Swiss-Prot record:
Its EC number is 1.5.1.5, 3.5.4.9. Belongs to the tetrahydrofolate dehydrogenase/cyclohydrolase family. Catalyzes the oxidation of 5,10-methylenetetrahydrofolate to 5,10-methenyltetrahydrofolate and then the hydrolysis of 5,10-methenyltetrahydrofolate to 10-formyltetrahydrofolate. CDD domains: NAD_bind_m-THF_DH_Cyclohyd. One of its GO terms (cellular component) is cytosol. GO terms for molecular function: methenyltetrahydrofolate cyclohydrolase activity; methylenetetrahydrofolate dehydrogenase (NADP+) activity. GO terms for biological process: L-histidine biosynthetic process; methionine biosynthetic process; purine nucleotide biosynthetic process; tetrahydrofolate interconversion. Keywords: Amino-acid biosynthesis, Histidine biosynthesis, Hydrolase, Methionine biosynthesis, Multifunctional enzyme, NADP, One-carbon metabolism, Oxidoreductase, Purine biosynthesis. It comes from Shewanella amazonensis (strain ATCC BAA-1098 / SB2B). This is Bifunctional protein FolD. The gene is folD.
C-alpha cells in the first residue's frame, strides 16, 4: 500500500479562492472589508516568517491587514493596551498575537485580553470552552484546518480509533476535542504516556504534534490509517521533515500529510475563515 498525499496547499488555495470571492461580493454589496490585526513582538526569525505568510494571505483574499511590529523590549502593559485599542476598533474583526512571546510577557494574560469575538486564533478560554461544550464558533486554527484535511479524504470518522500525540494548548488539546466532536474514540498521548508504540499502532487516525523530527517510526503506523503530521523540523542539512518517519509511514498509511505542504497552509486558511466568520456573525 502506498498512501495518498493529502495536499494541504491545494485545499488551502481553494479556500482562499472562495474567501476572495466572498470578499468581492461584500464589496460589491457595499459592505465593509474584513480586517485582521497581526501583532508581532520581537525579532524571532521563525515568527517573522509565519507573520509574513499570514499578512500576505490576508492581502491575497482582499482583507484589510493591520500590522503591529513591536520590539522585544515592549512591556506587557503596552501590549495589553494595544490589544485594548484593537478590541475597540470597528475596522478590526480579528486579532492575532504571534506566539511565542518574550519571557517577560504572560501569554495567557495576552490571550485572555483579546475579545472572544475577535479571537480568530481560537485560543481564548471562552472559545476553547465552547468547543468542549460541542457548540464551537471560532475554533483553534490548526485543529480546524486538520479537520478540513480529514474531511477531504472522504473517510467517515465516526467510530474511528484516533490518537493524538502531543497535548499542547495550541494543537493537541483542541485537536482531541475536535476528534471527539467528529465521533472518534480519542486517546491523547503526552510525555507521561506509557507504551506509546502500542497506542500508535491501534490508531485508525493519527495526529502527531510534538516538534521532534521522525519521532514516530513509520513502521508503527497501522495499515490503512490516516496520518496527520503537524511537525515541521529543520535538519542540519537544511531539509524540512515532520514528526513522523514519512517514507516508511507512506508505505503503510492510506492517507498522509506531507511536510511541508500539508498542515501548515491549512492553519493560515483557517485563520482567514475565522476572520470572515467574525466579520459576518459578530461585527456586520
Amino acid at each position: 500500500m502506498t498512501a495518498q498525499n493529502i495536499d494541504g496547499k491545494a485545499i488551502a488555495r481553494a479556500i482562499r479562492t472562495t474567501l476572495s470571492d466572498k470578499v468581492k461580493a461584500r464589496k460589491e454589496a457595499g459592505q465593509r472589508i474584513p480586517g485582521l490585526a497581526v501583532i508581532l513582538v520581537g525579532l524571532d526569525p521563525a515568527s517573522q516568517v509565519y507573520v509574513g505568510s499570514k499578512r500576505k494571505a490576508c492581502e491575497e483574499v482582499g482583507f484589510l491587514s493591520q500590522s503591529f511590529d513591536l520590539p522585544d523590549t515592549t512591556s506587557e502593559d503596552d501590549l495589553l493596551a494595544l490589544i485594548d485599542r484593537c478590541n475597540e476598533d470597528p475596522a478590526i474583526d480579528g486579532i492575532l498575537v504571534q506566539l511565542p512571546l518574550p519571557a517577560h510577557i504572560d501569554s495567557s494574560k495576552v490571550i485572555e485580553r483579546i475579545r472572544p469575538d475577535k479571537d480568530v486564533d481560537g485560543f481564548h478560554p471562552y472559545n476553547v470552552g465552547r468547543l468542549a461544550q460541542r457548540i464551537p464558533v471560532l475554533r483553534s486554527c490548526t485543529p480546524m484546518g486538520i479537520m478540513t484535511l480529514i474531511r477531504s479524504t472522504g473517510v467517515d470518522t465516526y467510530g474511528l480509533d484516533a490518537v493524538v500525540v502531543g497535548a499542547s494548548n495550541i494543537v493537541g488539546r483542541p485537536m482531541t476535542l475536535e476528534l471527539l466532536l467528529a465521533g472518534c474514540t480519542t486517546t491523547t498521548c503526552h510525555r507521561f504516556t506509557k507504551n506509546l508504540e502500542d497506542k500508535v499502532r491501534q490508531a485508525d487516525l493519527l495526529v502527531v504534534a510534538v516538534g521532534k523530527p521522525h519521532f514516530i517510526p513509520g513502521d508503527w503506523i497501522k495499515p490503512g490509517a490516516i496520518v496527520i503530521d503537524v511537525g515541521i523540523n529543520r535538519l542540519d542539512d537544511g531539509r524540512l521533515v515532520g514528526d513522523v518517519e514519512f517514507d516508511v509511514a507512506a508505505e503503510r498509511a492510506a492517507f498522509i500529510t506531507p511536510v511541508p505542504g500539508g498542515v501548515g497552509p491549512m492553519t493560515i486558511a483557517s485563520l482567514l475563515e475565522n476572520t470572515l466568520y467574525a466579520a459576518e456573525n459578530y461585527h456586520d
